[in-house]
Each structure stands twice: as structure tokens, then as C-alpha cells.
Amino acid sequence: MTSPIRTERRGAVLEVTLDRPKANAIDAATSRIMGEVFAGFRDDPELRVAILTAAGDRFFSPGWDLKAAAAGEAPDSDYGVGGFGGLQELPGLNKPVICAINGLAFGGGFEIALSCDILIAAEHATFALPEINSGTVADAASIKLPRRIPFHVAMELLLTGRRIDAQEAKQWGL
């Protein structure tokens, strides 16, 4: 079985690619691998910057793997070092991480992008936090999004689940 995470070193740059067909959804096992990769990046003095991207051009990531949830994986599973996606709670990470978003970034996928220092989105990229539509809150995004864009816009996105395209994301400073 191939790994859902591919890495490539290019000098001082580490490229990390999420590659889980069909949509790059993240289950607990993938999250743990991502945490190990980003902890290794943090601890490697020769690496200066990481680029996080995803395979394909339709999805960056919809976040949590709902098929894994339907199969019994709990929402509070052990996601490993760094929390969900390996970046949200990684202590001591003092190197920049660039997120190259090449498609849909919803829910936890958007939250992982918000954990990065710089977001670069393809023109066709879209963002949303649809958790509100199922009666939950995008917990990490409720902290991170208002720090990056105007509070009232962040609250609208968090409380409505409205999608925004790359152009609007740029307009608000993402």
C-alpha cells in the first residue's frame, strides 16, 4: 500500500503532498503520518521551509474522512503529534509552512490551511467551513480565521458555512 503522504526534499525545501484518492480526506492514520512528517521538518536544521499541497486539481482536502467516521473512527481519535493534519497543534514549529491550495478546501482541510503561514490558492480553489450545517463548530477555524481576516467576515463564514472562491479569499486577506 502506498503512503497517503509523499515528501520530496529540494535543498532546504520540503514539499509535502497529501495523496488520498478520491478527495484527499484525512483519517487518523493519515493525520499521524502528517504529524511525523512536520515534526521531522521542525527538527531538521537543514530544512528551512515546507510547502503543503495535495494531489490532483479538484480537491485540496475536505478535512476529516467521513467514510472513516462511518466505519467507526471517533471524531476525537488520536491524530498524533501536531493534532489533526499534523500542523494544528505542533509545538515549537518556528519555520514557515506555505500551503498551496489547488482545489476545494473545506472543513478540516481549510483549518489545516489556516495553520500554515502563507496560503497560495489556484484560481479555481474554494473554501468553506460547512460544519455549522451539521450542528457543529469548526473549532480550530473559530480561533484561527478571525486572526487572519476581519472578524465580521470570519463570523459569517463560521456561522453560515458559505463558500468563498479564491478571489474573495484574496480580497479578505487570506
Task: For the regions a language model picked out, list residue spans one by one.
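Generic recognition of short, well-ordered alpha-helical segments
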Residues: 28-29, 64, 111, 140
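Crotonase-fold acyl-CoA enzyme core
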Residues: 91-174
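Hydrophobic/aromatic residues within transmembrane alpha-helices
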Residues: 16, 52, 65, 112-113, ...
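Conserved CoA-thioester-binding segment of acyl-CoA-metabolizing enzymes
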Residues: 1-57, 72
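Glycine- (often His-adjacent) and acidic-residue-rich active-site loop
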Residues: 30-33, 54-92, 133
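Glycine-centered loop/turn positions within well-structured domains
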Residues: 24, 57-58, 143, 155
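A generic local structural motif
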Residues: 1-4, 35-39, 82-88, 105, ...
